[in-house]
Each structure stands twice: as C-alpha cells, then as structure tokens.
C-alpha cells in the first residue's frame, strides 16, 4: 500500500497500491466496493473528489488519472510531471488539484479547464513528498519536502509566503493542517 484516503460521506477508504491498481473498501462491512487496475507502475497517491464522484490518482509512470468511482470508467489520463507523483490534495471548494512530485515541483490543476496546469510552484531542492490545502484559508497550501523544509504558498503567487526549516537531518514526508475551528 502506498497511499490512503477516506471518503467524506461514505464509509469508504481508497487504497493506492504498489501493484499499479487502486481499491475502494467499505470499512463498515469490510467488503471491497471497487478495484481498478491502472498501470504497471506503483500508484503512490490518491484522493476522493466526492462532489464529482471521482478518484484522482498519481503514479510512478508520471501520470495523473481520474476515474468515476461509481462506474469505474476513466475520466481522463495525462502526464502531469516528468517524474514520480508523490502527493495529491483536492481543493475544498474550487476545481483544483495539487500534485507534488520528485521533479521538485508542485502543480495546480483545474479540472473545469480540461485539467489545465494553472500554476507550477518551484523552489524545493528535493522530492516533494506531501501537499495540503489550508482549510481555514483555501487560497493557501503547504508542501513538505525531503530538502528538510515545509513551504507555505498562496495560489497565484510565484514564491512561498515563508519556509520552515523543519529538520536538520531528516526530510519532511507529510504535512497537514489542523481542520477544526477551535484554534486559529
């Protein structure tokens, strides 16, 4: 297993696998909802896009793939990066998907514009392992990287708002935001 995501409304978990397929499981009944073989490369990242009935997944063949999780039909497939896709984040309200890659970049994709790349964020010096939107400011997101940093960005800006040197000797494998409203 390479990645995992939980559906926001259904009792489902999405699992992305080294074997090149994805599986959706019902964690209440412990039964498989769907299995979709995608490619011969590991699938490292995946997310539900519940408002569209989609899953979006990224793999080691550099492609971003989108499938309808109810029918299993492919919506689209395209080369998103020239290297492995490590992480995916879905914007909470806008038609945006972020991808983080071993090519040292984060890209912002717009599915309402035929999956056009709206922006490429550069500045990391190693593999981008994780991306996450800020639930309290959805114009902002963070990226975590093996260059020991977390960068916080704003959509539409070419440079990060700031960079945190997270570790002296270890890379950053995961970033996330606190989702509840009881803290700033």
Predicted regions, residues:
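WD40/WD-repeat beta-propeller blade N-cap
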Residues: 1, 37-43, 79-85, 121-128, ...
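WD40-repeat beta-propellers
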Residues: 4, 22-26, 64-68, 88, ...
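Beta-strand-rich domains and repeat architectures in extracellular enzymes and scaffolds
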Residues: 1-20
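Beta-propeller domains
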Residues: 17-33
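A short beta-strand motif characteristic of beta-propeller blades
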Residues: 31-36, 73-78, 115-121, 159-164
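WD40/WD-repeat beta-propeller blade-loop signature
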Residues: 9, 32, 42, 51, ...
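Loop/turn segments within WD40 beta-propeller blades
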Residues: 5-10, 46-52, 89-95, 113, ...
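Conserved strand-to-loop turn within each blade of WD40 beta-propeller repeats
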Residues: 16-19, 58-61, 93, 99-103, ...
């Amino acid at each position: 297993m390479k990645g995992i995501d939980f559906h926001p409304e259904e009792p489902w978990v999405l699992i992305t696998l080294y074997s090149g397929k994805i599986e959706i499981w019902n964690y209440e009944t412990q039964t498989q909802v769907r299995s979709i073989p995608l490619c011969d490369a590991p699938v490292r990242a995946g997310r539900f896009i519940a408002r569209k009935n989609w899953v979006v997944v990224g793999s080691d063949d550099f492609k971003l793939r989108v499938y309808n999780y109810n029918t299993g039909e492919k919506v689209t497939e395209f080369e998103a990066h020239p290297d492995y896709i490590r992480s995916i984040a879905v914007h909470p309200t806008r038609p945006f998907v972020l991808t983080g890659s071993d090519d040292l970049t984060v890209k912002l994709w717009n599915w309402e514009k035929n999956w056009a790349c709206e922006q490429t964020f550069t500045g990391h010096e190693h593999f981008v392992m994780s991306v996450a939107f800020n639930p309290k400011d959805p114009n902002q997101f963070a990226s975590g990287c093996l260059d020991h940093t977390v960068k916080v960005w704003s959509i539409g800006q070419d440079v990060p708002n700031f960079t945190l040197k997270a570790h002296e000797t270890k890379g950053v494998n995961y970033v996330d935001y606190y989702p509840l409203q009881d803290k700033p």
